[in-house]
């Protein structure tokens, strides 16, 4: 939509359609300020600067044109008659003509240039209408100055251009907020880093860092790159990047994201990713692609805007002809035609959707919800069913204690004894029991004569008594019968360990893949908005049934092999518009098959090819957030399209003079004010999306 400078297409920080906002200008040349790998990140900032430069240009043209309009108003006979004074001297008419010419060519330049850009692309729109309207008024008035019979429209022309310039300036200010989110992401990144080299700290530009370098991050500083902590411990604030509200604890071996804010500890970070591979750059690229991708709704709005332009030009011409035939007053007929063209607002139609998209994709990105496919995001509003992969999505993918049953010991005693014995074991079950004891604040008791029983469990003396923590297989070997409560736990697919005291069963501890605390809230939120919740798992049916009952799922599919997941999704699709939620690795075909594929828990690796939407955090509640945002986005689009269509349907006949007999007639200046307001309303409504 623009003449592009050396930055090319990549310079766009928002939708191609967003360029309608400022299609009346060329890019100003930018200096290349960074090396190639840092360049894309700066493009959106450059584009924002360019947008601001254009705003300033409109403001400057508005001020100059307004100053020139003052003498035009004073010298205009119509204004003199209205205000009851007379200013006339030799050549005053020619001075009026020269001042009006200056306003037409200087103030009207963006619109005059815009018509050539639009016609060259064969996409007449807003600029075409304004340019035709001011040109008709200017050349007709000029002809009157040089002998044609009639009245001139110089003061109307000048005020019309002033209002158009001001309207576009206000509109661009309103719109800038939509495209500012990407610039904010870019601003997060620090420009310098403390490189550790030969035992010394060297200040270097971030773009000069390479994988393997080690950088020092001091307390309160922003982390300059994606990397791995090799020294130090701290809490890191990632809220601006992933939407994670609480600071995240970081220790050696943990990954950190460039742009996150370090807490009170110092960290030494080994550089892992630079340039376009960094998390932030990938997010910026995904948001840019989402904002530039077209959707059916947008195509419809674009066609409607083009059609509206043709209608306005046609109605303007017909209005001119009808009024000429009706009252044979050429000046009056010209004024009606000009008003029709300036009051029509294809801009409001053209911006109705891209503005909302720019706001919603940016809002989503800041919350760690990355939209890769805009059409899929729009489909999310129609979802009827969501299928979750179990392991790592609804559950944590690791053992946790779910039940403790004591026969002659309290739960707390049993847990403390079991944890004390298991503390020396590396087994995942042992780790889960110790973790549960720590969580409940129990200290470990000293164990004497500790011994591991290979493949069966552990034993030792605690508080003078011999205890064992053993598997069900060992219990069978001993010929010990278990009661109903134990059998019930087994039927739920849980792993059960027995605690024996002096050879007798004192109690059992049941463990299972731990259900995420957020899963219950996520499922209840989705069900509250009328969406059926289902689960796919390769796990056995007992485990699947237990998880489904715990979470209140509508249905579940157990013992499904990875290659069968896509088939199950297809089955559900026969009844419902379906989303699939998984980690994007072993369920890639299922994500691709679903109407909306959602990869969850992507962390810093956001380039999940098969997913339409990527959720950075491992939080199922974000699925409900995506559906809600999709519905709100669609609602805003509808509001904007309804407003833009309704406004034009009402304004065009009014401008043509259908209520002339009732004494209602709009001047071109009033038409221009209404047109500007209609676009600003669309922009403000889009920004109200939350």
Swiss-Prot record:
**Protein name (Swiss-Prot/TrEMBL):** Copper-exporting P-type ATPase B
Its UniProt entry gives the catalysed reaction(s) as: Cu(2+)(in) + ATP + H2O = Cu(2+)(out) + ADP + phosphate + H(+)
| Region (Disordered) location | 23-46
Q: Which residues bind phosphate?
A: 390-391, 537-538, 565
Q: Which residues lie on this side of the membrane: Extracellular?
A: 86-91, 149-151, 325-336, 662-663
Q: Which GO terms describe its biological process?
A: copper ion homeostasis
Report TM segments: 65-85, 92-112, 128-148, 152-172, 304-324, 337-357, 641-661, 664-684
Compositional bias per record (Basic and acidic residues), positions renumbered to this chain: 28-46
Matching PANTHER family: ATP7, ISOFORM B (PTHR43520), P-TYPE CU(+) TRANSPORTER (PTHR43520:SF8)
Temperature notes read: Optimum temperature is 85 degrees Celsius.
On the tree of life, the source organism's domain of life is Archaea
Specify the enzyme's EC class, one word: translocase
Function field: Involved in copper export.
What are its E.C. numbers? 7.2.2.9
Q: Which residues lie on this side of the membrane: Cytoplasmic?
A: 1-64, 113-127, 173-303, 358-640, 685-690
Query: Which parts of the sequence bind Mg(2+)?
Result: 583, 587
Give this protein's Gene Ontology molecular function annotations.
Answer: ATP binding; ATP hydrolysis activity; copper ion binding; P-type divalent copper transporter activity
Q: Which PROSITE patterns match?
A: ATPASE_E1_E2 (PS00154)
Q: Where in the cell is it found?
A: Cell membrane
Topology in the lipid bilayer = Multi-pass membrane protein
- What family, per the record? Belongs to the cation transport ATPase (P-type) (TC 3.A.3) family. Type IB subfamily.
- Domains: what does the record tell us? The histidine-N-terminal metal-binding domain (His-N-MBD) seems to have a regulatory role affecting the metal transport rate by controlling the metal release/dephosphorylation rates.
